[in-house]
Amino acid sequence: KFEPGTQFEYNSLNTYMLSAVLRKKTGMSLTEFLTPRLYEPLDIRSHHWETCPKGMEKGGWGLNLCIEDLAKIAQLYLNRGVWNGRRLLSEEWIDAATSPQIPTPNGEMRHGYGYQIWMSGGGAYQFNGAFGQYAVIFPQYDAVAIIYSGSTQLFAKTSLMQLLDSCFWACSDRELAPYPPGYDSLKAYLAKLVFSPEPERKGLGTDKIAFNKIRSLLDGREFRLFDNYGSLFPQPLQNVHGCYSKGADIIRFSSTEKGLAVTFYEQCERNTVYIDMDGGFTDSVFIMKEEQHLVSTRGIWSAGESEACITLFTSFLETPDTRIIELRILNESIEAVFDETPTAE
């Protein structure tokens, strides 16, 4: 389309290629390269980077970090590459990475792009991930803000980000004059703050009589889906992982001690989720093209004389994504309606 470096077009595969180049040049995986240089100095112990079929980290996506550890990386940049008195990144690199290397005139992020970093304007910059994952660095206020969320907006500036911007841009560069009454009020307020006790996890108040009726109706039954393109795997995750499904072909039900197992057949894949009759969550492992994903499923249901309806909520625990499937069973037929949250709009 154009000569490299002359125009901007967002493309995560470019960063995947950088991961491949690093492996070729160093003989190390991206994780092996980063461990002594970044993870160990920052005491980042819980990390996982998804790999491609060739065993290379995907580079442009697929990094899983705790929110506290992402905050450490953001703080490292705020410290201009220094951590606990030790320099991990050169100041020259920090300056180059956090400065506009190419203009981004289109879209909502129009302040330019550095080295995998978006400029936010006013000297701020951010690591921006899909569906509301942010690390925003405000050097002029000596602050970082970390946000993990499940926004329906893919990369655009969300209302939460706009609120964050408005709070920081309202700050003054001048020191506040002493105001003892306000300070005393703040201390008293902070002293009263406590963590709420962990609430008891309860079911959804679902009807066990209706559930047992549905379970006896569906136990051992199998339904074939025609002209269906919906998958148990949410569409955003299909796009991110490059694991595309042609849709579920068959749904099979079987009774369990605590509820009902629902198995989805999709081409060569077979995945089972579980409904707890108490309305609670049940964990399982979802597999798509050899990649494993931890999921947790709950269900709600209703039953009539000759029909039943089950709604499944399957959350992919390592992501912000939840697949929602409504199954309407009438006599010998089934209708499956697929939805998800967040969804790219």
For each feature predicted by the language model, list its residue ranges.
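Catalytic-site signature segments of enzymes, centered on catalytic residues
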Residues: 1-63
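Active-site-proximal alpha-helical segments within enzyme catalytic domains
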Residues: 14-21, 59-82, 133-150
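Residues that flank catalytic or metal-binding motifs in active/ligand-binding sites
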Residues: 59, 66, 93, 113, ...
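A conserved catalytic-loop motif detector
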Residues: 66-77, 82-104
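Active-site Gly/Thr loop motif
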Residues: 91-148, 154
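Peripheral terminal and inter-domain segments
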Residues: 181-345
